[in-house]
Regions:
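Conserved Rossmann-fold dehydrogenase catalytic segment
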Residues: 1-11
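Amphipathic alpha-helical segments within well-ordered protein domains
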Residues: 20-28, 91
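An accessory alpha-helical subdomain
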Residues: 9, 15, 25, 29-36, ...
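Alpha-helical protein-protein interaction elements
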Residues: 2-4, 29, 48, 61
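N-terminal hydrophobic or amphipathic segments with adjacent small-residue motifs
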Residues: 7-8, 16, 49, 91
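Short intrinsically disordered, low-complexity coil segments enriched in acidic
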Residues: 1-3, 20, 122, 148
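Short acidic alpha-helix initiation/capping motifs at coil-to-helix transition points
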Residues: 13-18, 81-83
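NAD(P)-dependent Rossmann-like dehydrogenase/reductase catalytic/cofactor-binding core
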Residues: 34-158
């Protein structure tokens, strides 16, 4: 239950939705897609590493005063009570078995769903900006991986 919740609400679903929404907000306001990608996606690893090494409070003690002020005053506005209520609903779906039933029904009805779901969820401008940034950094430009359901997708990146 905890693993499913973490994947859906924070580590995969929540993180991807937060990054995508922040990226869209900046691009719609006229900022270059590459700059938006760098700020909202690429730098995520740096913050995650600080939290992993030092905890949330330790991360807060290592960021700039401006970033800290924004964290403490704007973060709760982004992730407020409404988000907590939705997270509670997601956990209830997992605990009741509703998520498992939904997932199994989807796979039975649409055997190709994982790839189709990836295709529908692809954010063209975000992925294009990511390919440019990764290319400039000497990394593989494509974000494509082995595909859902493989052992390789469950391994943490270096």
């Amino acid at each position: 239950e905890i693993d499913l919740f973490g994947e859906q609400a924070v580590l995969c679903g929540g993180m991807a939705a937060l990054c995508r929404t922040a990226f869209e907000t900046l691009v719609e306001a006229g900022y270059p897609a590459e700059a938006a990608y760098l700020e909202c996606v690429q730098q995520l690893r740096l913050t995650a590493e600080l939290v992993e090494k030092h905890g949330i409070e330790g991360m807060r003690r290592r960021i700039s005063p401006t970033a800290l002020y924004g964290d403490l005053t704007r973060g709760p506005r982004v992730i407020g009570a409404g988000v907590k209520a939705i997270m509670s609903e997601i956990l209830a779906e997992i605990r009741s078995g509703a998520f498992a039933a939904e997932w199994m029904a989807r796979v039975a009805e649409e055997p190709g769903w994982p790839e189709e779901g990836l295709r529908r969820a692809r954010h063209e401008s975000l992925e294009a900006a990511g390919e440019i940034i990764r290319g400039l950094q000497g990394r593989p430009a494509s974000g494509a991986g082995p595909g859902p359901g493989t052992a390789a997708d469950r391994q943490m990146p270096d």
